């Protein structure tokens, strides 16, 4: 395992944002803008690249990192700092302690989530379903209506 081979404290795999699959959830911190900016290209000859921040979805962290945050900074590791989310806040603390993080960018994971699905009466011709004749009543105007829905 790379974490052991290179004696690293933090290693993340690579995965994409749920809503932007073309953007990886790994960042470098831009000191000028004070923003975490996504990394879009990786050196194909390297197993690992240093990162400033990453999502926690494929993250390996040594226990000693959490212990140092609590004992040296007196803060919970993932407590939000200002407008930053939990993940960026965690990595801001590790940078403050001089702990480097790396991305094993060839280790890729999927970003799980949920998707709201709404019914659509406009079925494609390839949809397999059974047509039923039903009788209904009521319209949005309050008038009675009878008919069949196919």
What are these regions (language model features)?
Residues 1-77:
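Conserved catalytic core of nucleotide-sugar-dependent glycosyltransferases
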